[in-house]
Amino acid sequence: MEKIIRQYFDCWLKKDIVPLKEIFADNVIYTECYGPEYQGLDQVLRWFREWNEKGTVLKWDIKQVLAQGNTLAAEWYFECNYDGAVSGFDGVTLVVFDGDGKIASLKEFESKAQHHHPYDCR
């Protein structure tokens, strides 16, 4: 399962849509961290094509992966240039795989990359 999520992130780094057809189930539900939800492989492919026309993923570094049964959680750092603006954030992806080893459900969650320490006494 970890190999598949790494392959998926690599698709973004290389702007390579071809492997997505083998990574995702036809009936996948993909929920982005800021609200959009893509229903089915066709919508995921459309989003991938359209996003990559305006943006480039600069980094998608996996920090850790936890897997149990058919479920995987990956913590990562993501950075991109979209419409000329570079931004990045920390995040977590929760993935459920189907019986064929394809991604049936993927949900992303975002956290600020910059942290502050409100109780730091320095």
Predicted feature descriptions by range:
Residues 45-122:
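A beta-strand edge to alpha-helix "cap/lid" segment located at domain peripheries
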Residues 14-27:
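Short, well-ordered alpha-helical segments enriched in acidic and aromatic residues
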Residues 2-3:
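Amphipathic alpha-helical repeat elements characteristic of tetratricopeptide repeat
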Residues 6-10:
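Amphipathic alpha-helical repeat scaffolds
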